């Protein structure tokens, strides 16, 4: 049936690295949610039928499997959705550092690092850490909600060592 169909239109997606960069640099969390849904769509296509499981749940299960493979226990990272804005999304600083350390060892590590906001240069960190050793050195994702402020990413030490870090402030009032 589809062999005889006419294509009425086509929309091509930007490359994954551009989607990731748009999501991370400016904290466009809907882009990041859509990446989780894309993973979930692929996972559901590969899964045996098991009743109704949403695309989001398939994506969360895939992410949970990756975290377990890295050695992050379920109690250290609870994923409720892909934006990080839900109160059901919980992660310890240690879990984030373990994930960042794992990602730093992957072939796409440099692409990911460049997709993160850079202190004093661009994205959500453009106005932060200027005229400090962190400027143009810290590559990190920001995250904030009422009374919650987080920063997780990479920094290069004065000795040239690349470090993963996560800073989380809860019940923080400016």
Regions found by a protein language model. Give the residues of each.
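A small/polar active-site loop signature that marks catalytic segments
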Residues: 1-110
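C-terminal soluble interaction/assembly domains
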Residues: 62-65, 74-174
């Amino acid at each position: 049936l589809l062999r005889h169909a006419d294509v009425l239109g086509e929309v091509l997606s930007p490359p994954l690295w551009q989607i990731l960069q748009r999501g991370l640099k400016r904290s466009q969390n809907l882009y990041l949610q859509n990446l989780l849904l894309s993973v979930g769509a692929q996972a559901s296509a590969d899964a045996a039928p098991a009743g109704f499981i949403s695309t989001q749940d398939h994506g969360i299960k895939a992410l949970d499997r990756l975290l377990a493979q890295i050695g992050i226990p379920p109690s250290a990272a609870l994923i409720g959705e892909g934006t990080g804005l839900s109160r059901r999304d919980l992660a310890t600083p240690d879990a984030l550092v373990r994930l960042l350390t794992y990602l730093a060892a992957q072939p796409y590590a440099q692409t990911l690092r460049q997709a993160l906001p850079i202190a004093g240069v661009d994205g959500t960190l453009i106005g932060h850490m200027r005229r400090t050793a962190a400027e143009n050195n810290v590559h990190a994702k920001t995250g904030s909600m009422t009374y919650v402020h987080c920063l997780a990413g990479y920094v290069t030490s004065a000795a040239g060592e690349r470090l993963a870090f996560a800073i989380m402030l809860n019940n923080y009032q400016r």
